[in-house]
Amino acid sequence: MVRALRVTCARQHNSDCSFMIVCTLALMTLASIGNPIFPGDYADPELHLFQGKYYVYPTYSAAYDKQTFFDCFSSEDLREWKKHSRILDFKDVAWSTNRAAWAPSVIERDGMFYMYFSAGDGAGIGVAKSAHPEGPFQDVLGKPLVKEYINGAQPIDAMAFIDDDGQAYLYYGGWKHCNVVKLKRNMVETEGQFKEVTPENYVEGPFMLKRGGKYYFMWSEGGWTNSSYGVAYAIADSPLGPFVRKSHILDGNPEVGTGAGHHSVLKLPRTDEYVICYHRRPPKSTLRDNRVTCIDKLIFKENGEIEPVVITREGVLPWPAIKK
């Protein structure tokens, strides 16, 4: 997909039309980024804008015993991505059981970057810290931040969110239950009660977005190993809910990709446009761990509701990152 632009040459008697060639080359840079956005089996991607670059923090999609680390990827335009290997390695996280490194969530506060991660298929949710968005990250507590199965929620799939008033929250949960708990200013301790906020059909992968004073709570539902996987959302007036299921917004397409889910959303800088970053399986793939990271448009209607996402092979147009 290429954006259509009308270009008029100001030089009427230039046989080689060098000006038009330059314009054509400029238009070529507007070609879509293409999906998947980088090679390799990666799932559960969280997309951010930090320090003038886009960052994607995914799960390495493989057998649990091979999931012993986290990589991340950075880009200045959503098109060209640089891999940062092993930004956190479970050999340095003694309590992790050295397996099942899942669903990292990264957030910036006071010049530091905090990563909340799942370990050991339910061993707990940890928190690691770095001075740089590309790491390396180091485990802060030497133990899980969340270990117990509270309100029936498996301690996996954390998502950190800071509201406009500065209050930080941690959403998390598998096994069809979701909790939210406040984080202290230091970002490595919880405070207060764990509140269950499970909406209808919730399975895992919570994500929170604030837009226009409303709280858009999103999650994955269905089975992650098959084509039933997808994303739904709710709208609330508070980060604590209640979250009443609105509709399904992300599904697979057998011609493009299946099992589309476990996503994140980002507003592009200097625009009112949003993108959704998610994983899916290539068409006709039946391999459990063959999941790839993609980006497509997320469109809000005038009434604030979200349109169903159209998943594509082309993806979105490149867009330059800027420092916040």
Where does each model-flagged region fall?
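Basic polycationic patches enriched in arginine
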Residues: 3-6, 11
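Carbohydrate-active catalytic/glycan-binding domains of CAZyme proteins
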Residues: 27-324
